[in-house]
A protein has these predicted regions:
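Sec-dependent signal peptide recognition
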Residues: 2-10
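Beta1/beta-strand and adjacent pyrophosphate-binding region of the FAD-binding site
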Residues: 175-187
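Hydrophobic h-region of N-terminal signal peptides that target proteins for export
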Residues: 10-18
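Extracytoplasmic
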Residues: 20-173
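Residue-level detector of alpha-helix initiation sites
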Residues: 187-188, 212
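Flavin (FAD/FMN)-binding glycine-rich loop and adjacent Rossmann-like elements that form
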Residues: 171-175, 189, 216, 278, ...
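Conserved N-terminal/central alpha/beta ligand/cofactor-binding core
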Residues: 196, 202-203, 208-290, 330, ...
Length: 609
């Protein structure tokens, strides 16, 4: 098993011309205590950050060491964000203290209305080593991007705070790698693409921006697998998922349900895969209409990768990097006139399915603080429940990429505000007196953002009329399942809905989706698998569930092996080697005699196998 072991270390001393200008990246702190690394919004703010996600209980301190070159008085700035400011004009709940060598300098995180550098105080520091700490005061998701310590008067750090400025202060090392196939995104689709290609002889790099594998099916998000496997024209597809798929179904369940270690073992067993967990893809280098290499950054150390290959697959969902490559894409809902879809709106718009912040409570007597930061609950509009799963969905009328942090934050705001009402004010609060929050997601479970355009765009008629295509590949079996704001929630919170509903349009039989939906129409060496494949918004309602995206990944891995074998690009497989691809899909790549453990959460009765 080839592995890249990123040496995660904190470069806490500014490596620039002035030893008295020091940038401490929070995600690189030597000890994070109870703070979590949050990389979800790097495309917008250029950096991960630490978040104190304690569900109302302060988390353990984070700290790191740094060196001062000259004794003197230093100003201390913290880049932070008062996360409830879009809904509440006063101080927010995310307060935390900062200090040096055990002495508090100031409190921050609960004022302002955007990510910004806040001056928290001064500290007299002697030359030599010191220890900087973050002390959470509330447990309500205070966040710290970076700390800037300077002895220069009026040396306020750059507000833009982009990667170039950070790199100048803290240079990072770059590691290069050459592969046959680079897969970006370690969810179910990316895992299946990487393993399939590796078993067919390709040297594969698999890049994932979280430390755990499985994407929405990991213990960080906790969405169960959905859809049927081993059905349709190519019954060999899907058996691979038996090898790593959790045996239990259910959303928002205890972490053990999602079997993170099983997924990791599944990947580590493949000698042809080099794993890069904790690396976020941030850029591309192009060679004409092909990707030459992808760059990625470690979400803790800041170390960089440059991975080159003749073939790439993007399986991240948002597809930000390949948009930088110029790949054609769309987002939102097509109007009826474009594809004559019955379930499309009359005119196109930017509405998407939302992102879920799931949660549950457990037994335990614990007080919960008053949480009033812009959500006004009462007994007529609150949710009198002990848990919230996929229906706790936000952001359907917001941009799922540029407004992703606010969408996630609004999800957390509603959970905390509702729970505070139930615990402290509800007429039925006695029912909740022996309950406490057991888990609230801070990694949002996205359903939809960008969709990349391939040589074919799957639409509603293809599915409902069972239109045959010669390049039929993976089968989609889930209903056309399109989410929209819940009608009662809309009445109670117009324009600020946090609950969703759906109408399932059941499929009568599996539908075999064209292979041409799995590669880009204008970036010639780019495959895609996952919720970002070439489909309309309506068609995405069926193709987006995770067993189905896993089979998409299998097809991509098989096609990549044929690209290498015949020295062609993805389109060349369709034009010249379709029979060979069909043979691979019918045979499958999954191991034989693996127990059939995936008999939950499907909408078509499984075939006996």
């Amino acid at each position: 098993m080839n592995r890249f072991f990123a040496t995660v270390f904190a470069l806490t001393v500014c490596a620039c011309a002035y030893a008295d200008r020091i940038l401490l990246e929070a995600e690189a702190f030597e000890c994070k205590g109870g703070w979590k690394t949050d990389q979800q919004f790097m495309d917008i703010m250029y950096s991960p950050y630490l978040i104190a996600h304690g569900m109302g209980n302060p988390v353990e301190n984070a700290y790191t060491s740094f060196n001062v070159g000259e004794t003197g008085m230093y100003d201390v700035y913290v880049r932070t964000y008062n996360w409830t400011s879009p809904w509440h004009s006063g101080k927010g709940p995310g307060a935390f203290a900062v200090g040096v060598d055990g002495k508090r300098i100031g409190v921050t995180g609960n004022t302002g209305d955007s990510w910004a550098w806040q001056h928290v105080g001064k500290a007299k520091l002697k030359s030599g080593n010191h220890k900087f700490f973050l002390k959470d005061l509330t447990g309500f998701d205070g966040r710290c991007d970076a700390v800037y310590i300077t002895s220069h008067k009026d040396d306020v750090p750059q507000e833009k705070c982009d990667a170039g400025w950070r790199e100048k202060l803290n240079p990072r090392r770059t590691t290069e790698g050459k592969f046959d196939f680079v897969v970006v995104g370690g969810g179910i689709a990316g895992m299946c693409a990487a393993v399939t290609a590796a078993r067919l002889g390709l040297r594969v790099a698999l890049v994932n921006d979280r430390p755990v594998w499985g994407g929405n099916n990991s213990s960080e998000v906790r969405v169960h697998l959905g859809g049927n496997i081993e059905m349709g024209a190519n019954k060999g597809l899907g058996r691979l998922i038996r090898e790593f798929g959790p045996e239990k179904g259910g959303n928002a369940q205890p972490s053990s349900f999602y079997e993170d270690s099983k997924k990791e073992y599944f990947l580590k067993a493949e000698k042809n895969i080099t794993l890069y967990p904790g690396f976020r893809a941030v850029g591309v280098v192009m060679n004409g209409e092909k990707i030459a290499s992808v760059s990625a950054v470690n979400i803790e150390s800041g170390d960089k990768l440059m991975l080159s290959a003749p073939l790439f697959a993007h399986c991240t969902g948002d597809a930000t990097v390949v948009v930088l490559a110029g790949a054609d894409w769309c987002m939102g809902r097509e109007g009826k006139d474009e594809f004559h879809e019955r379930y499309a709106p009359d005119v196109p718009d930017f509405m998407t399915m939302g992102a879920s912040v799931q949660w549950y409570s457990v037994e335990g007597k614990e007080k919960f603080p008053e949480f009033k930061y812009g959500m006004n609950f009462n007994d007529s509009n609150c949710e009198q429940v002990l848990m919230g799963e996929w229906t706790w969905e936000t952001g359907m009328n917001r941009n799922q990429i540029t407004q992703a942090e606010q969408i996630r934050d609004y999800g957390m705001l509603t959970v905390y505000s509702n729970w505070s009402w139930l615990k402290n004010h509800s007429d039925k609060k006695a029912k909740y007196s022996d309950r406490k929050l057991g888990w609230v997601a801070y990694v949002a479970g996205k359903r939809e953002s960008r969709r990349l355009m391939g040589d074919y765009i799957l639409k509603e008629d293809d599915i409902l009329k069972n239109v045959y295509h010669e390049d039929a590949s993976f089968s989609t079996t889930w209903s056309i399942d399109l989410h929209f704001p819940d009608s009662l929630n809309h009445v109670n919170f117009p324009g600020r809905e946090f609950k969703s509903a759906t109408n399932h349009r059941l499929l009568k039989q599996p539908y075999d989706v064209p292979y041409r939906c799995l590669y880009s129409r204008n970036v010639n060496n780019l495959f895609m698998a996952g919720r970002n494949i070439s489909v309309t918004h309506v068609a995405l309602g069926t193709t987006r569930v995770m067993r189905t995206t896993g089979m998409q990944g299998e097809v991509v891995g098989m096609a990549a092996s044929l690209c290498k074998k015949h020295s062609v690009l993805p389109r060349g497989v369709y034009r010249s080697y379709l029979p060979e691809l069909k043979a691979l899909m019918q045979k499958g790549i999954g191991k034989q005699n693996v127990p059939d453990n995936q008999n939950y959460n499907y909408t078509i009765e499984p075939e006996k196998r």
